[in-house]
Amino acid sequence: MQTLISGWSNYLNKYEWTHTATVRLHYKISEISADKITTSLVRYKPINYLFYCVENDRYDINHIHLLLNAPSTIARDSIAKGLGKYSKSVSYFNEVKSNKAISWYCSKQLNLNIPYDLKFKEQYV
């Protein structure tokens, strides 16, 4: 299973990630829901491509980690708008400081049968 994690981590590290975000909703995020809201986000004008994974929390709820490639001027409110959610749903938003570190962090639980995907704007144009 470690091979899956290191494989994805190395693969993601090849992309130029500019921002990272965490999305927390007031309900458990299903695989279908995660797919729908991340598709909405990648279709949103400023986003070029993204990677997401849904991670479980302690209290039978979960959250989405996002890796984004977007202009440096993008803000938390823009991410929420692209997701079609309220701004507080984006509980964390920041520029990427280390591509290698964030690629590992966002792939660390991929062996736990969680939803994840890499999406490019060109897929949805």
Give the location of each predicted region.
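Right-hand nucleic-acid polymerase module
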Residues: M1-N62, A70-V125
